[in-house]
Curated annotation (Swiss-Prot):
Position of the signal peptide: none
BP GO terms, sorted: dUMP biosynthetic process; dUTP biosynthetic process; nucleobase-containing small molecule interconversion
Family the entry assigns: Belongs to the dCTP deaminase family.
Native source organism of the sequence: Yersinia enterocolitica serotype O:8 / biotype 1B (strain NCTC 13174 / 8081)
Annotated positions binding dCTP: R110, S111, S112, L113, A114, R115, D128, V136, L137, E138, Y171, K178, Q182
Pfam families: DCD
Active-site annotation: E138
Record-given protein name: dCTP deaminase
This protein's record includes keyword Isomerase: no
Uppermost EC category: hydrolase
Amino acid sequence: MRLCDRDIEAWLDSGKLGIDPRPPVERINGATVDVRLGNKFRVFLGHTAGFIDLSGPKDEVSAALERVMSDEIILPEGEAFFLHPGELALAVTLESVTIPDDLVGWLDGRSSLARLGLMVHVTAHRIDPGWQGRIVLEFYNSGKLPLALRPGMLIGALSFEPLSGPAARPYNSRQDAKYRGQQGAVASRIDKD
């Protein structure tokens, strides 16, 4: 059962759930909290690799990832990031989120953006118990026109679901937590699997 708006506010008030900066009550709706787009992005570079063998040797996968991902792009205030049709890019939420060990979070895109062809998360929309950091967005433009994305715009909504008990292995306590504490648009670390 997902938390309703009153329960989300109570979890925030108690400090068990953290969203920084804390959203105003107007962005806590029914069963979700609206989140905004941050100013950090990463894109795939031109065809610098014919393919990435995801099950290949870790050093080869790592080298291929280095060749295909840009450095982090930090947009100055007031500028837009343009996502062209058929392009995939990474970005982050403006808000940093701290989820306790007995709660799981879910990120959904906004219907208004989906109707323009913008996918906010390609497949990874679960936010694990014990998560701390910004949420990386996997943008894909499936529409026909370029989309101008500006930091600070509403980009998605978070919902939260209590677990039957605290997780035995919450994300931030795991040694294999590849994205622990991320604050930027961290590229895939599949080579760390």
